[in-house]
Amino acid sequence: MMAQKSQGSDNLQEGQEKSKREILKCTKSAWAPLDEWLPPDPEEESQSLTIPMLEDSKQESIQQWLDSGFFVSANENFQQVIDRTVSLYEQGMVQMTVKDYMRSLHQFSETPILSRGTSFNSCYSTASVPQSIPEWLEFWEIDPVEILLDLGFGADEPDICMQIPARFLGCGSAARGINIRVFLEAQKQRMDIENPNLYGRFRQLEILDHVTNAFSSLLSDVSILPNRAEEKAGGESVQRTSVSAAKEHRRRMGKLLRRASKQNIRRDCNPEVSESFKVKDEVFVPFTKPWDCGAELAATSINHKQNHLSLSVEHQSLQACDDLLPYPPHGLLSKQWPCSSMPAKQAPPSCVSEGSVKGRTQKENLFQTNKLKSLSHLAGKGPDSFEMEEVQSFEEETGNPLDMTSGTVGARVDRANSCQSDSSGFLEEPLEPLPLQMPSLPNSQSPAENGGRKPRDQSHSLVSSQDCQLESDGPDSKSRASMSFSSQEANALEQRASVSVMEEEFLLEAMEGPPELYIPDMACAKTTTRGECPRKDSHLWQLLPMPHAEYEVTRPTATSKYDHPLGFMVTHVTEMQDSFVRPEGAGKVQSHHNESQRSPGNDHTQDKFLHVDSEAPREEESSGFCPHTNHSLLVPESSSQCIPKHSEITPYATDLAQTSEKLIPHLHKLPGDPAQVKSRSGTLGQILPGTEAEMENLPLNTGSSRSVMTQMSSSLVSAAQRAVALGTGPRGTSLECTVCDPVTATETRLGTKARQLNDASIQTSALSNKTLTHGPQPLTKSVSLDSGFSSICPMGTCHAIPAHCCICCHHHPHCHGERQSPGPEPSVCRHCLCSLTGHQEAQFMTTLKALQDTTVRELCSCTVHEMEAMKTICQSFREYLEEIEQHLMGQQALFSRDMSEEEREEAEQLQTLREALRQQVAELEFQLGDRAQQIREGILLQLEVLTAEPPEHYSNLHQYNWIEESNGQTSCSKIHPGMAPRTVFPPDDGQEAPCSGGTQLAAFTPPTLENSTRMSPSSSAWAKLGPTPLSNCPVGEKDADVFL
């Protein structure tokens, strides 16, 4: 029995082994191509003959796999894969791995796949087919090693980027703004460069600390040097730090001496002129260049946006130029050109004591120390860039030390072509002075003007006099002076500011010829080529330099006064501000000479108005102009001598700056006493120390004529649009007001060309008195508004002397503190309501009424009504949309059963679009309502501010500020009650002067324009005050009060 059982078991085992052997034979035929086509054994061939042959080998293979319990996809892809694998091996490539084989079969096989690495014992037979889910999961288990290898692990790669999977590098990132490759390169570079040692980093901090200490000590030494130099009266020069510095100093000193000797030769050639250049005080050095004294600082312009130092008016003549220099006095950035005819204010109003000089010295040192802190990067090259040694060396040679009372009136710097990129810009010993060069601003190109060719004469003037004759000698008579400096602190200076000092030229074509006026064409005067945007100082055709010229120079402006021996006085004010460049295209400056010939018997003067207009873009300049106006006021003192004067104003191409000069009758003088002319200038966005040029010895029986053209800012768009309805549209409006003793007339002139340019420029006309005038003559002021406004602006009438005409614009409150002087010189802003103290309440109520009538009714209410109308339209449109939507939804509910799927989707899309449209209309409606509410609140806020302030604030003009708002809007003018259209002031003789014009010019002045006019207190009668409408004032603008 045991033998039979053992034999039965043996038979069973043999049967199982036989079946396994047969399965192996069947499966091995399938693996044969992968086993490099090994020849089969003879036994296997003989046994395979017993297997029934099928018609197709493919069906036989399927049957064999089915019998063995495996399922292979019976399609052609399997055979294609095998054939491809065979071809790869035939080409000699490496044998395929398990991973590659599984990937090649996985794309078309959905059944279990036999792996080459699995032995026959591990293969499932008919009895070991997976019967449960865990077995099938184990059968389909993926090898984790292959996954890690796919991810890039397990490979020894030197590049760290290879550890990142290929899908992150091969495919672009869906995130915006992320560049994986740039990030990886940056990280790799950082790992390569960075020093992982922390000690190295702390060492860097230590080195930086040492460098900071060194610079701090250097700055302290430099700040102490000017005090020592002043105490020693310029007796010693700065020590040379190196041999090269000494050589450079000697070279510059030689150049300076050669130039000084050349000026001495010129002075000797003109003995008549040199007689007038005598030393008035022992602290001044004789000036060797005659025409420099008359025009050295007459056209000074400075780029200065931050004014953080308030100075008193009584110290203007002593420290005005010092404010222009951020550097110590021992480095005056210039050659001290001594001038005997440019004394600091020696008149009694401006004389100060020694204590005030010491106090000014302390303030000056503190100011210079603060400036030096912002210029630490320039401390290392002071002697080279700033020519500190040159000034003191020249003082040693001439034996004239610096004087504190003289300031830096005669200081200037010779700068080379502005195309140089270094900080100093000095050339190597030029043989002769080069043409006038303009330093460039940070935001504008400034190619050299008249560069590379001989500069032509910019001014021609013929004056017949007995004691003052001059002749200039070509290019040497034109000197360049500019001071360039930079700072690192925003509160001190802007990126790059430049102070440009020009001197005017005077040419005598004939030594004893009759007086003749030569007016060149302005088109010829422009030498800028296409594509250039140079900054050009105005070329003024003025009188000869006066023997006694006094200067008042402040930080942003410079005012010069010429005291002509013949009795003429010229006030020249120059101002520049880097705040705003006109966006319009280029304009060509054209000169229009409007001459009105009047008979000598009518006691009228011959007025010539030179209008410089920015017309349409021309070929000569492609950059936009931002006018920078330099204008001068000429008032003849002697009625028996009539000298022509021509003033040409060329606007600067960089900044918007406006200066205005008005004839101001003195407040404390009788009609027969000399009058006083004040020149006030304001700059947009900064505090202006006022520049006041007083004109003494001006009789009232002389005629004067002046033309001022003002172009408004481009922010007054809404008013310009409304002006179209009045018939003016974009046409330039020019108002000419002739103020005389018996009659005040207003004449309105419309421009002949439509202009869209909204810039601001002020210019003065030429004064030409061809006849002898005795007695009061009309003072003609022409104002041109190129802003697209109508001329309906109220203005009160006034007569010549003792009228009170005050046009006061709101400005920085710092102006008043700076202009208040204890001396006899009155302040400009102190006179505003000195004669109106008894009428404050009536004026206040009239002003409030005028504000309500003009701003609320004509401007703001119209805009609010328009917004309300648009809001109503949007609301009705939204309601209409809702009705349509309800109707469509009802129709859709009825026919929804018959609609197809596409029609339903289209209906849903239309519904979404309607909802979005309704939402946008609602949002627009809300915005319109909110805007209207903001306008109402703004008007109410202005009224509350106006009513909350006491009336005495009007006398001090502290109530508002002319700081430019972010939206770029300009001022909206309020009309003082005195500015009624038919207000008439009786003259001294009691006669009542009727008004010949319906409307008068109001304060349509830009925020940078500030005009002050005084009248004599003898004006006793005031007309009835009444409100008048002021049209075309934009909403949200600042206010300007106009007092008459």
From Swiss-Prot:
SMART domains: KRAP_IP3R_bind. Keywords: Coiled coil. GO terms for molecular function: signaling receptor binding. InterPro entries: ITPR-bd (IPR029325), SSFA2_C (IPR029326), TESPA1-like (IPR043444). Residues 1-14, 460-469, 480-489 have a biased composition (Polar residues). Residues 388-398 have a biased composition (Acidic residues). Residues 1-20, 230-251, 388-489, 583-607 are annotated as: Disordered. It holds the Pfam family KRAP_IP3R_bind. Residues 896-937 form a coiled coil. This is Protein ITPRID1.
